[in-house]
Amino acid sequence: SPPVCGNELLEEGEECDCGSPANCQDRCCNAATCKLTPGSQCSYGECCDQCKFKKARTVCRIARGDWNDDYCTGKSSDCPWNH
């Protein structure tokens, strides 16, 4: 089925989906189009802060056991597994 903008599920073709325009509280996301607002790089994620990607080498997941800390790349809002 085609993506539905406004259902709070990020689907193919959408950059963000914060719900209906009446309920959206995300200034990084245009609720009517499910696209990022002008100047925004992201709207969510461990490596997203105030609509921008966090700087590279920012810790996004603390080490546990034998694993190393995980770091933002500066190019994505996702926190990659670096172990």
From Swiss-Prot:
Residues 2-83 form the Disintegrin domain. It comes from the Eukaryota. The keyword Metal-binding does not apply. PROSITE patterns: DISINTEGRIN_1, DISINTEGRIN_2. InterPro entries: Disintegrin_CS, Disintegrin_dom, Disintegrin_dom_sf. It is found in: Secreted. Expressed by the venom gland. Disulfide bonds join C5-C24, C16-C34, C18-C29, C28-C51, C42-C48, C47-C72, C60-C79. Belongs to the venom metalloproteinase (M12B) family. P-II subfamily. P-IIa sub-subfamily. This is Disintegrin isoform D-3. The lineage of its organism: Eukaryota, Metazoa, Chordata, Craniata, Vertebrata.
